[in-house]
């Protein structure tokens, strides 16, 4: 298991990164890092269980590790302490690349679409996101991969309960001289997940009451995306007809995000106490069962129906021998 790293001896400089949370820049062992701090929020009378964002570094760490386990390239993260404060160091993947390369956020594609400046929002519409993915000429070389990434990223965000995957929180690697998009960027910014503002008392209440754990994860969070003009809960969206292409990714992702996998990630997270370990394991398990599970079972049935339909069509269709027919073969897997 990794240990919590003491970053106190290192000089932290002004942040060169955007975003709301407190952050600084650190050079360590030849690598550049964005250092994110946990922090206390003012108590809210209407939400007494949401009084602290001190868990944000841990949530960034666990969320990033879950993404990495899913097979999606993800930022490297190190949990640490800076002069008594909890922090997470996120390695700047651009720092070690060719200086002629730059990170291009999806937001920049939105506003460069015809009429995009009026349709690009802090919380994007799925219909517009889909149009950008399908039509933007800058994606010509990686269009299929970009759509695949967004669909899978949304599914993993549903597992970790990330409510902040807006258009500035994912993107591409581009040539700054020509603005040509060359590749997908690793996933970054996963801190707004796993109930980052929940107090220890709130954690304890959920751990001690499985029904509350289930209901809390079914009810929240909302996605950082509108669908049909409304912000949707992950659980509602993933079982809707609109989400069919999203849940079609779940049979591939499911074995990579099993209970064994996420439990191991939590066990290997340094610095957690017993309550936190139980809470994070139980939260990921609840979200897998109640948010992803129904959509996964739908995806299996839809795949079976699609295969059966293709099979029936095949009987009545003249097919040139030796040419594979799409949709045949492949075991979608079993629900664990």
Residue ranges of each PLM-predicted region?
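Conserved ATP-binding subdomain of kinase catalytic cores across diverse folds
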Residues: 1-117
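C-terminal catalytic region of ATP-dependent kinase domains
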Residues: 176-327, 333-335
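Conserved kinase catalytic-core segment
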Residues: 55, 127-199
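ATP-dependent phospho-/nucleotidyl transfer catalytic cores
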Residues: 93-155, 159, 240, 264-269
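A broad, structural surface signal
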Residues: 61-69, 148-157, 282, 286-289, ...
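A short, terminal or domain-edge coil/loop segment
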Residues: 2, 7-11, 126-141, 199-201, ...
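Short alpha-helical "patches" and their helix-cap loops
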Residues: 77-83, 166-175, 300-302
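An exposure/low-complexity boundary signal
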Residues: 90-100, 160, 166-167, 172, ...
